[in-house]
Amino acid sequence: MSTYGKVYLVSGNKGKLAEVQSYLAHANIVVEAVKFDLPETQNSSAEKISWDKAVEAYRVVNKMPVGEPLRHGGTPVLVDDTSLEFDALCGLPGPYIKWFLDRLGVEGLLKMVKGFAAPGEKDSGAAAPAHRGANAVCIISLCHGVEEATGQPLVEQFRGVCRGALPPVPRGGVGFGWDSIFAPEAQTPAYAKTFAEMSVEEKNTLSHRAKALKMLTEYLKTHALELRGTKLVA
């Protein structure tokens, strides 16, 4: 059986780190956080934004000078990007949710969809009015080296989606970010709790990040031989 090593998660968010560590611990992967600012590509594609960040993170973590070709054999890095897509706004804020949250706060985000209710539509947290529908999306990008023949970065991406709805008001006191304004559909009863009202164990069974982490873990297990020679698989 392969021995899994260490990977760096580029994040200063302790809540996010705890979620990633909790999940990957089952695969014997040690996750350590490194914190530094990464430039964000201005692009409507969350996958493109995450891909660019993962490549730059690999360069920074492995101290490879800007302008020089990336080298193989460095320490692998993970970049985790989330999007929150409001049905009423045709997918916005999407990958720009961090900036919307910083400027507006969770209550301001809820106000963005308030005027989209259909005439006579009941605004209830128990149901899911059409104007409150939303998708939580997580893109995890793993940069684990460079294709030596072409010089192209080796980046694998894993996309997890959780369908849910926005409650009329923020609910719950745990979690982080916008957890208090997203209630997943895949619970009984549907939309009963926001992420901020769930235990870590509950959240890790159905969240967008959990789905992406599951795909990442399966990839690491099935591609262990290919990853030998990197610092991720010894």
Swiss-Prot record:
Its cofactor is Mg(2+); Mn(2+). Homodimer. Mg(2+) binds at E40. One of its GO terms (biological process) is nucleoside triphosphate catabolic process. It catalyses: ITP + H2O = IMP + diphosphate + H(+); dITP + H2O = dIMP + diphosphate + H(+); XTP + H2O = XMP + diphosphate + H(+). It is found in: Cytoplasm. One of its GO terms (cellular component) is cytoplasm. Its EC number is 3.6.1.66. One of its GO terms (molecular function) is nucleoside triphosphate diphosphatase activity. Signal peptide: none annotated. Pyrophosphatase that hydrolyzes non-canonical purine nucleotides such as inosine triphosphate (ITP), deoxyinosine triphosphate (dITP) or xanthosine 5'-triphosphate (XTP) to their respective monophosphate derivatives. The enzyme does not distinguish between the deoxy- and ribose forms. Probably excludes non-canonical purines from RNA and DNA precursor pools, thus preventing their incorporation into RNA and DNA and avoiding chromosomal lesions. CDD domains: HAM1. Gene3D superfamilies: 3.90.950.10. It comes from the Eukaryota. ITP binds at residues 11-16, 53, 81-82, 98, 176-179, 203, 208-209. Pfam families: Ham1p_like. Binds 1 divalent metal cation per subunit; can use either Mg(2+) or Mn(2+). It comes from Leishmania major. PANTHER family: INOSINE TRIPHOSPHATE PYROPHOSPHATASE, INOSINE TRIPHOSPHATE PYROPHOSPHATASE/HAM1 PROTEIN. Keywords: Cytoplasm, Hydrolase, Magnesium, Manganese, Metal-binding, Nucleotide metabolism, Nucleotide-binding. This is Inosine triphosphate pyrophosphatase. Belongs to the HAM1 NTPase family.
